């Protein structure tokens, strides 16, 4: 008991220190980009969320857009088979809240930003909502949120779980902390055997662990709609044009691609830049201007009829807009401090996939894609040649599309396995 109390106090102290270290950056985003203004009351516990109705409650949580989006087939199936349950969906980012509201409010879910995990804030929220089940998407577990839910009798599960090599080393160094952090989870449903070994390395019993594959490979029919014609018409791309979508790009990705794009003088090659963070839009624009690349902004009504390069300065459209592409690149993979983003979205839209050398956030998946030749790993030196070959060779592009479809087909049972495990837990509960 004393050890648990001490761990909680040290964890609180760490969060407070982290807040003060990040404060200048946070206030910069508030005053110059208007971020966090709509969510600060809930984040700091000033305003408590309210869930309508009666019945058992399941609380889903994911860090941001990607983690929240993968919950879609799960919530749809849950609603079909257990309609008496109420849903709560939380996320740590405003973009994630925007996405969750778009996807889940029509299912009756209550969506809000996760309050800070300080014991004096989150515990009162958990007590008010009193969830029967808490489900964490991929790995965004928060200690006080988890332990308070368990104290109140909730079941807690991790789905599509993963643990990076960096996090594994950190928790291995603090093995007791790692065990305390994840031990309250009743089940860990993981993407791969490698992640299983890492969780066991930090002290999690193998009895709690199931390996089902990556849920992101599952394509719900309603989510797999390919709107290629719709987006190409909206972007004003002709049938002769070739479109490269650069998704979730960071400034370092832009620097590398700007050099390559400057070689494309052919007006039939169009480039759509989709920033990961809209608050860095000015930085992206300056990099393109420095490289002498003329571009327009989507928000200002620009299209490919006027420009060969467009910046998509809108939220929540990337996954859909991949369908318009002839080639797709996933950003964050030329930035060693980021380590990549969702590699599967282009494949789900039947588009050839490229990614850079820094992909440690999804290293296992990246290696599988390389082995199956379902994705192209490029670096600064090879990028121009690879892109040129794909643009000029439709047969090669189609080959990568077919390999991508085959890869997804082989992996698509991951969702069904995950659902069967969760379903067995739901039906055993006495509500």
UniProtKB/Swiss-Prot annotation:
<dbReference type="GO" id="GO:0005886">
    <property type="term" value="C:plasma membrane"/>
</dbReference>
<dbReference type="InterPro" id="IPR039901">
    <property type="entry name" value="Kdotransferase"/>
</dbReference>
<dbReference type="InterPro" id="IPR007507">
    <property type="entry name" value="Glycos_transf_N"/>
</dbReference>
<feature type="site" description="Transition state stabilizer">
    <location>
        <position position="216"/>
    </location>
</feature>
<comment type="similarity">
    <text>Belongs to the glycosyltransferase group 1 family. Glycosyltransferase 30 subfamily.</text>
</comment>
<protein>
    <recommendedName>
        <fullName>3-deoxy-D-manno-octulosonic acid transferase</fullName>
        <ecNumber>2.4.99.12</ecNumber>
        <ecNumber>2.4.99.13</ecNumber>
        <ecNumber>2.4.99.14</ecNumber>
    </recommendedName>
</protein>
<feature type="site" description="Transition state stabilizer">
    <location>
        <position position="138"/>
    </location>
</feature>
<feature type="active site" description="Proton acceptor">
    <location>
        <position position="67"/>
    </location>
</feature>
<comment type="function">
    <text>Involved in lipopolysaccharide (LPS) biosynthesis. Catalyzes the transfer of three 3-deoxy-D-manno-octulosonate (Kdo) residues from CMP-Kdo to lipid IV(A), the tetraacyldisaccharide-1,4'-bisphosphate precursor of lipid A. Thus generates the genus-specific LPS epitope of Chlamydia, composed of the trisaccharide alpha-Kdo-(2-&gt;8)-alpha-Kdo-(2-&gt;4)-alpha-Kdo.</text>
</comment>
<dbReference type="GO" id="GO:0009244">
    <property type="term" value="P:lipopolysaccharide core region biosynthetic process"/>
</dbReference>
<dbReference type="GO" id="GO:0043842">
    <property type="term" value="F:Kdo transferase activity"/>
</dbReference>
<keyword id="KW-0997">Cell inner membrane</keyword>
<dbReference type="Pfam" id="PF04413">
    <property type="entry name" value="Glycos_transf_N"/>
</dbReference>
<keyword id="KW-0735">Signal-anchor</keyword>
<feature type="binding site">
    <location>
        <begin position="315"/>
        <end position="317"/>
    </location>
    <ligand>
        <name>CMP</name>
    </ligand>
</feature>
<keyword id="KW-0808">Transferase</keyword>
<feature type="binding site">
    <location>
        <begin position="342"/>
        <end position="345"/>
    </location>
    <ligand>
        <name>CMP</name>
    </ligand>
</feature>
<keyword id="KW-0448">Lipopolysaccharide biosynthesis</keyword>
<dbReference type="InterPro" id="IPR038107">
    <property type="entry name" value="Glycos_transf_N_sf"/>
</dbReference>
<keyword id="KW-0472">Membrane</keyword>
<feature type="binding site">
    <location>
        <begin position="275"/>
        <end position="276"/>
    </location>
    <ligand>
        <name>CMP</name>
    </ligand>
</feature>
<keyword id="KW-1133">Transmembrane helix</keyword>
<comment type="pathway">
    <text>Bacterial outer membrane biogenesis; LPS core biosynthesis.</text>
</comment>
<dbReference type="GO" id="GO:0009245">
    <property type="term" value="P:lipid A biosynthetic process"/>
</dbReference>
<keyword id="KW-1003">Cell membrane</keyword>
<keyword id="KW-0812">Transmembrane</keyword>
<feature type="transmembrane region" description="Helical; Signal-anchor">
    <location>
        <begin position="5"/>
        <end position="27"/>
    </location>
</feature>
């Amino acid at each position: 008991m004393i050890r648990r109390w001490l761990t909680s106090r040290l964890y609180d102290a760490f969060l407070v220190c982290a807040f003060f270290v990040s404060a200048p950056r946070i206030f910069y985003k508030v005053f110059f980009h208007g971020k966090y203004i709509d969510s600060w009351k809930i984040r700091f516990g000033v305003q408590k969320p309210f869930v309508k109705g009666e019945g058992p409650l399941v609380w889903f949580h994911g860090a941001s857009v990607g983690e929240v989006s993968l919950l879609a087939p799960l919530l749809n199936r849950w609603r079909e088979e257990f309609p008496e349950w109420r849903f709560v969906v939380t996320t740590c980012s405003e973009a994630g809240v925007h996405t969750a509201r778009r996807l889940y409010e029509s299912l009756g879910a209550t969506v809000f930003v996760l309050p800070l995990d300080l014991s004096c804030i989150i515990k009162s929220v958990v007590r008010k909502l009193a969830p029967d089940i808490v489900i964490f998407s991929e790995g965004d577990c928060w200690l006080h949120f988890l332990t308070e839910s368990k104290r109140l009798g909730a079941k807690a599960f991790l789905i599509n779980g993963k643990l990076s090599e960096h996090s594994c080393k950190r928790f291995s160094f603090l093995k007791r902390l790692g065990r305390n952090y994840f031990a309250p989870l009743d089940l860990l449903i993981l993407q791969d055997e490698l992640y299983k070994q890492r969780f066991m390395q930090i002290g999690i019993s193998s009895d709690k662990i199931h390996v089902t594959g990556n849920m992101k490979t599952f394509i719900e029919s309603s989510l797999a709609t390919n709107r290629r014609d719709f987006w190409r018409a909206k972007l004003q791309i002709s049938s002769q044009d070739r479109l490269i979508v650069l998704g979730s790009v960071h400034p370092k990705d832009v620097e590398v691609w700007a050099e390559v794009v400057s070689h494309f003088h052919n007006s039939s090659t169009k480039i759509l830049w989709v920033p990961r963070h809209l608050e860095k839009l000015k930085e992206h624009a300056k990099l393109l201007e420095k490289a002498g690349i003329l571009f327009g902004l989507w928000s200002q009504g620009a299209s490919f009829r006027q420009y060969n390069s467009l910046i998509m300065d809108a939220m929540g459209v990337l996954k859909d807009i991949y369908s318009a592409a002839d080639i797709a690149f996933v950003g964050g993979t030329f930035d060693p401090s980021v380590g990549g983003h969702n590699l599967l979205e282009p494949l789900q839209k039947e588009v050839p996939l490229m990614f850079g050398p820094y992909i440690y956030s999804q290293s296992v998946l990246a290696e599988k894609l390389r082995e199956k030749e379902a994705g192209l790993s490029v670096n600064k030196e090879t990028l121009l040649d690879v892109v040129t070959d794909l643009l000029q060779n439709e047969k090669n592009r189609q080959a990568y599309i077919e390999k991508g479809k085959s890869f997804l087909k082989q992996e698509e049972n991951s969702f069904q396995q995950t659902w069967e495990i969760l379903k067995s837990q739901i039906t055993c509960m006495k509500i």
